[in-house]
């Protein structure tokens, strides 16, 4: 299932490598992203500085989730991630706890985009390497098909 995220508020809690990767994936589909973290990667800092992400450099507050469609908890604090999960479930917000598959309402597929075609591949969070191999195979097939035209 693909969801139009263009007008949906997305909150990412965390500023490390996983949060940065998730944000870069989401930026392919929306610019309505808020990242909340006391510290961030340099890449995420630059995305905020360039205006691609609303970057809030402080610990997360419950009020950060007001009107959120989805929240990604990508901190290195499992207690905080668990609290984020609990708050989101109470408020009916889709949530993804990056390091706990059992606390994910959605997964991040491997994405391949070419012109108007978007392909998403997931192994339901179970086998990332296999999903990546399938994405590469699809990418190679799509590129070969384009070369034939």
Features from the language model and the residues they span:
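Hydrophobic beta-strand scaffold residues
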Residues: 33, 55, 94-95
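Residue-level detector of alpha-helix initiation sites
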Residues: 17-18, 78-79, 125
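Glycine-rich, highly charged phosphate/nucleotide-binding loops
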Residues: 46-66
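Glycine-rich adenosine-cofactor-binding loop
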Residues: 1-22, 130, 149
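Adenosine-phosphate binding glycine-rich loop
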Residues: 4, 112-149
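ADP-ribose/adenylate-binding Rossmann-like module
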Residues: 70-75, 81-107
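NAD(P)-binding Rossmann-fold cofactor-contacting core
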Residues: 21, 29-47
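Short loop/edge segments at beta-strand edges and connector loops
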Residues: 37, 55-59, 99
